[in-house]
């Protein structure tokens, strides 16, 4: 197959050349989270969303690292909390739900996913991960195993969630958030970054793991072996 690529950068209207996340929504718009604003590209032009002084319905933080579409609306993860974009009003609202212990999401958000059972998982640097149930509107926090979560990934059968940690390596939970096990990624105890799992991706049923500065591993879910 033939692929054609076009570079899109600040000179073309992009708010910043550092792009952290990208999403094509159900309406065909391409959303790009950057270090200086959220961009919406429609194929012809680009609209930039940033913080507007004294405007309560704008983003309060321009550093956007995570995006997901939930019920036609956009969930926007920044480095100081979560915002919901309402498509009908073209406005943002701060996600102010709290846990039963009155904890709200205030840390840098690295990844947001929605699991098969409808739960929304939110990975943060500093507060572990949160799980939000849209049906009950209940928010729970898990920071027992690790406080610094870099990435989230579902298993091939959608029954488990893998979490990459900057402290403990690769962690596995069931779809409801129950801790199952830890996977040891590197045996090189002399490497200062040997357990820092940076990213995980499900490709054709295998979990690919990027760890440290130069390590790529593969988890076979059937045998639970890492090579």
Can you name each region flagged by the protein language model?
Residues 1-227:
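Carboxylate-rich, polar loop motifs that coordinate divalent cations or form catalytic acidic clusters
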